[in-house]
Amino acid sequence: MRKIIVTLVSMLLGLNAVAQNKGIDFLLNKLYDGGKSNYVMIIAHRGNWRNAPENSLQGYKQCIDGGIDGIEIDVHMTKDSAIVIMHDDTLDRTTTGKGLVSDYTLEQIKQLNLKSPIGVVT
């Protein structure tokens, strides 16, 4: 059940990130048009991770400004049951932290820095 809730929250957050740009009704109509449209929906994986830190507000803003239809995100739960946006189960690749997201509290994660797409601390 917990995994289902986390999945639903991540889907809603991803749609909400772009809803103000094109409108949620526009996106939902394209998702549920029964295959009648030739529209190709563009979804950014982990935000604009090639040009900004992965899953960062900067990357999401670039996606929205660029007209992207949606942003795919993954969510994980911290040790104190807070939900954070993180692609990996671990912090090592994209932050200055080490180990599992679930081993850290939200306050501890807030003390970490993100890394750029080439691993430079931001």
Regions found by a protein language model. Give the residues of each.
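Metal-dependent phosphodiesterase/phospholipase catalytic core, i.e.
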Residues: 21-33, 40, 87-122
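Structural preference for beta-strand elements that scaffold enzyme active sites
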Residues: 41-43, 70
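Short, acidic/polar
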Residues: 52-62
